[in-house]
């Protein structure tokens, strides 16, 4: 018989750097999960993606065991990394803060494909381009 899921927790954590401190501790503690076990497993699985923020969805079961699914890094994080920026524009419609090329856009779209609701790489590229536009980053040919 399948285990009964009693909670779903969504977090965005730095790769390889999950600690029992907030936000991880309180989120998992209220479901009675072994926090150190999660931190060790998460850090082991994300060690090769250092410097990225990795979203994770944790399923907590009735017997207080857990499983988790790693997602691809948020589009905004990948775009900022490609453009070499720390943050997007405060006024994206007025102030442009950076540029990315079509090739970089395609690379980001291919990275995000598993998590995007897109049928083709072209439609994924237009989604990522929209995110870039809303951050004040222009896409060049």
Curated annotation (Swiss-Prot):
SUPFAM superfamilies: Ribosomal L11/L12e N-terminal domain, Ribosomal protein L11, C-terminal domain. One of its GO terms (cellular component) is cytosolic large ribosomal subunit. The keyword Iron does not apply. Keywords: Methylation, Ribonucleoprotein, Ribosomal protein, RNA-binding, rRNA-binding. One or more lysine residues are methylated. GO terms for biological process: translation. InterPro entries: Ribosomal_uL11, Ribosomal_uL11_bac-typ, Ribosomal_uL11_C, Ribosomal_uL11_C_sf, Ribosomal_uL11_N, Ribosomal_uL11_N_sf. One of its GO terms (molecular function) is structural constituent of ribosome. Part of the ribosomal stalk of the 50S ribosomal subunit. Interacts with L10 and the large rRNA to form the base of the stalk. L10 forms an elongated spine to which L12 dimers bind in a sequential fashion forming a multimeric L10(L12)X complex. Belongs to the universal ribosomal protein uL11 family. HAMAP family: Ribosomal_uL11 (MF_00736). Forms part of the ribosomal stalk which helps the ribosome interact with GTP-bound translation factors. This is Large ribosomal subunit protein uL11. The gene is rplK.
């Amino acid at each position: 018989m399948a285990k009964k899921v009693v909670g779903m927790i969504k977090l965005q954590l730095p790769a390889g750097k999950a600690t029992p401190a907030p936000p991880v501790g309180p989120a998992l503690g209220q479901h009675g999960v072994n926090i150190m076990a999660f931190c060790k497993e998460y850090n082991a699985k994300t060690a090769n993606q250092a410097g990225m923020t990795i979203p994770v969805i944790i399923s907590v079961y009735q017997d207080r065991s857990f499983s988790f699914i790693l997602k691809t890094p948020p589009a905004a994080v990948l775009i900022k990394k490609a453009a070499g920026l720390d943050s997007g524009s405060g006024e994206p419609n007025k102030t442009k803060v950076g540029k990315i090329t079509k090739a970089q856009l395609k690379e980001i779209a291919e990275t995000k494909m598993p998590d995007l609701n897109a049928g083709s790489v072209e439609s994924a590229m237009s989604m990522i381009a929209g995110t870039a536009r809303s951050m004040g980053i222009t896409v060049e040919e």
